[in-house]
C-alpha cells in the first residue's frame, strides 16, 4: 500500500483537532485538603487547616479565597475572611478579633487560626479557593466541635493483658508442636535404623547358610 493512502486528509485533521481541543478543559481542577471534624477544648486556640494542590502557581492578582461559617448544614453562610490581592478580615460580631490568617497562599496554604474558642463557635467552616487558570473552585468543609473538657484516655491495661495472654498461649502451642515434631522425627529415624539393621542381619544370615551348604 502506498504511504499516502493511509495519511489523513487535511480537512479531516483540522476537524479532529478542533474536536480534541473542544473536549479538553482549559484548566485542571484543584484538590483541597481539610480535616472532616476538628475537636477542640473550650477557651483554647485552634488552627483550621486548609491546603490545596494546584498545577498552577498562585497569582495574587487572580487568586481569591473565602472563609465562611455555618451554624448548621442548612443554615446560611456568613463570610468572615477573604483574600482579594490581600487578606481582608471582615471581623464578624461573633468572632471579633479572634480570627487570624495563618497560611501562605504562595505555599498553597490558606489556613486560619481561631483564638479563645467559645461554645458558640461550634459549627461548619467552609474554605473556598479560586486559582486561575484552574476552572473549578476548590471547597473544603470542616466541622468544629467544641468540648468542655478533655475526654478521658482509654485504659489500655486490659488490651495489654489480653494481648500478652494470647501471645503467651500461641508461644506455648508453637513450642508443643515443635516438641511433637521432634519426637516424631526421632521415632521415624529410629525405625528406619532398626529396619536397616534387621535387613543387614538378614543378609548376613543368608550368606552364612549358603557357605554351610557349599561345604
Swiss-Prot record:
Disordered, as annotated region: 187-215
Cytoplasmic side: 180-215
Entries under Pfam families matching the protein: V-set
Main subcellular location: membrane
Gene3D superfamilies (UniProt xref): Immunoglobulins
GO biological process per UniProt: cardiac conduction; cardiac muscle cell action potential involved in contraction; cardiac muscle contraction; gene expression; membrane depolarization during action potential; membrane depolarization during cardiac muscle cell action potential; nervous system development; positive regulation of sodium ion transport
UniProt-annotated site: Binds SCN2A, residues: 56, 135
Phosphothreonine PTM sites in chain numbering: 204
Phosphoserine: modified positions: 192
Record-annotated membrane-spanning stretches: 158-179
Ranges annotated as biased composition (Basic and acidic residues): 189-215
Subcellular compartments: Cell membrane; Cell projection, Axon
Annotated keywords: Cell membrane, Cell projection, Disulfide bond, Glycoprotein, Immunoglobulin domain, Ion transport, Membrane, Phosphoprotein, Signal, Sodium, Sodium transport, Transmembrane, Transmembrane helix, Transport
Residue ranges of every copy of the Ig-like C2-type domain listed in the record: 32-154
Glycosylated residues in this chain: 42, 66, 74
Substitution effect: residue 55 to A: Loss of disulfide linkage with alpha subunit. No effect on localization to the plasma membrane. Loss of localization to node of Ranvier
Function: Regulatory subunit of multiple voltage-gated sodium (Nav) channels directly mediating the depolarization of excitable membranes. Navs, also called VGSCs (voltage-gated sodium channels) or VDSCs (voltage-dependent sodium channels), operate by switching between closed and open conformations depending on the voltage difference across the membrane. In the open conformation they allow Na(+) ions to selectively pass through the pore, along their electrochemical gradient.
PANTHER family membership: MYELIN P0 RELATED, SODIUM CHANNEL SUBUNIT BETA-2
Protein name: Sodium channel regulatory subunit beta-2
Natural source organism: Rattus norvegicus (Rat)
Lineage: Eukaryota, Metazoa, Chordata, Craniata, Vertebrata
Amino acid at each position: 500500500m502506498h504511504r499516502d493512502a493511509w495519511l489523513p486528509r487535511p480537512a479531516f485533521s483540522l476537524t479532529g483537532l478542533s474536536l480534541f481541543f473542544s473536549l479538553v478543559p482549559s484548566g485542571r481542577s484543584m484538590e483541597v485538603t481539610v480535616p472532616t471534624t476538628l475537636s477542640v477544648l473550650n477557651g483554647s486556640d485552634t488552627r483550621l487547616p486548609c491546603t490545596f494542590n494546584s498545577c498552577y502557581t498562585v497569582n495574587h492578582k487572580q487568586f481569591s479565597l473565602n472563609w465562611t461559617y455555618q451554624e448548621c448544614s442548612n443554615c446560611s453562610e456568613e463570610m468572615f475572611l477573604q483574600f482579594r490581592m490581600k487578606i481582608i478580615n471582615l471581623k464578624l460580631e461573633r468572632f471579633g478579633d479572634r480570627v487570624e490568617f495563618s497560611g501562605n497562599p504562595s505555599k498553597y496554604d490558606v489556613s486560619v487560626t481561631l483564638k479563645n474558642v467559645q461554645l458558640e463557635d461550634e459549627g461548619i467552616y467552609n474554605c473556598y479557593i479560586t486559582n486561575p487558570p484552574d476552572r473549578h473552585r476548590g471547597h473544603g468543609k470542616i466541622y468544629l466541635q467544641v468540648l468542655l473538657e478533655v475526654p478521658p484516655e482509654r485504659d489500655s491495661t486490659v488490651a495489654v493483658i489480653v494481648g500478652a495472654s494470647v501471645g503467651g498461649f500461641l508461644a506455648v502451642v508453637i513450642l508443643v508442636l515443635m516438641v511433637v515434631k521432634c519426637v516424631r522425627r526421632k521415632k521415624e529415624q529410629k525405625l528406619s535404623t532398626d529396619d536397616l539393621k534387621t535387613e543387614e542381619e538378614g543378609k548376613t544370615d543368608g550368606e552364612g547358610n549358603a557357605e554351610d551348604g557349599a561345604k
